[in-house]
């Protein structure tokens, strides 16, 4: 059976000796241990895509890549990023992905100016619909988090898209046991090292919903071990004043998703039929001031985001549109992406990031203290909780960078036509497959499983922030 799937995957790949004959490379979108992501334009059609270039290496097996391809090939949903095509050369695999340029979920909230429960409900409804589709096809995402939820376009009514299927898994007999995911979003049964099922995705959606309604996570602690214990206990609470303006229906919805017992936890189907999603109980009261402030304080960008983000693609597409309508403009140009500010506020997320500096805490609005109050729904909840781009010189692509696709006949291009770095394929000596998102989010060169994030800590009767340790479970 495994051999048949492998042969099927091989037959689906298109062979190429020079990928640049098919695509014009326009921007660097991201880079990781084994892959680089570019904004490209297909020469034949003029369409824009995100091209994920994955090095072949003797130090790394293709099984994880084949798994990601198998998952992406199998799914077709309006709220899930699409794998358009696959190419293969002697040195690389190339995944041609649907380009998602609308920016990230938190950024869109901060830009709105007005934000309500109903807005959050519409987002979660799309996520539930997509995850329900995955589950019906025997696929568990296993790494749902706000950073993997991006808007398709910059338009106000844009759809939400689920991205990054590097940790996704096709269920066998409905049960899995390999620990993986992101701290803060991982279900209790995963941390308890028990066999688990698709219910882990529903728990993650519950955490995301909680954050969307208050701006901080339901589980936070000073250390990794304490954080994991809190999650395994399944305790959280809806603190005042942060939850005073939130409906009882929203709280009930969250309680059903953050159910410690996976057998009692809402499925996507049940969640979609809840009045907060399918009815009219989601309030239209503006909660933007409180939520936006907490998001900025607890999920700021520079802790996780790479220099190239969704704004870079939007900027490039607009510039490209103007250039193509100007006389005497060459089709293949070297564009200047927007420069990022080193002082930009930052948000914790990926365990691949190390935070060196903590932002100054605004004591005027502190995070809720770690108090223990009984949940009104019958559950006993708890308290909520840079890489510099050497390829950039003055905001433009540096010609000597290994991330820059070389023109034919210029300098030392690799045999694939993608980049010169493929000449040193096995130099990193890594043995794990790092699945970087095909979209515009953080993807470090080094695969670390520790990070420092800002967590609220109870001390001297008040909440304050301190650098704490969180971790992520190993990739399958």
From Swiss-Prot:
One of its GO terms (biological process) is signal transduction. It comes from the Eukaryota. Residues 338-352 have a biased composition (Polar residues). Activated by Ca(2+)/calmodulin. Binding of calmodulin is thought to result in a conformational change and leads to activation through phosphorylation by CAMKK1. Residues 277-317 are annotated as: Autoinhibitory domain. ATP binds at residues 29-37, 52. Residues 325-352 are annotated as: Disordered. It is found in: Cytoplasm; Golgi apparatus membrane; Cell membrane. GO terms for molecular function: ATP binding; calcium/calmodulin-dependent protein kinase activity; calmodulin binding; protein serine kinase activity. GO terms for cellular component: calcium- and calmodulin-dependent protein kinase complex; cytoplasm; Golgi membrane; plasma membrane. Mainly expressed in brain with small amounts in skeletal muscles, kidney, spleen and liver. Strongly expressed in forebrain neocortex, striatum and limbic system. Residues 23-277 form the Protein kinase domain. The active site is at 143 (proton acceptor). Keywords: Allosteric enzyme, ATP-binding, Calmodulin-binding, Cell membrane, Cytoplasm, Golgi apparatus, Kinase, Lipoprotein, Membrane, Nucleotide-binding, Prenylation, Serine/threonine-protein kinase, Transferase. SMART domains: S_TKc (SM00220). SUPFAM superfamilies: Protein kinase-like (PK-like). May be prenylated on Cys-473. Residues 297-318 are annotated as: Calmodulin-binding. Its EC number is 2.7.11.17. It is a peripheral membrane protein. It catalyses: L-seryl-[protein] + ATP = O-phospho-L-seryl-[protein] + ADP + H(+); L-threonyl-[protein] + ATP = O-phospho-L-threonyl-[protein] + ADP + H(+). Calcium/calmodulin-dependent protein kinase belonging to a proposed calcium-triggered signaling cascade. In vitro phosphorylates transcription factor CREB1. Belongs to the protein kinase superfamily. CAMK Ser/Thr protein kinase family. CaMK subfamily. The autoinhibitory domain overlaps with the calmodulin binding region and interacts in the inactive folded state with the catalytic domain as a pseudosubstrate. This is Calcium/calmodulin-dependent protein kinase type 1G. It comes from Homo sapiens.
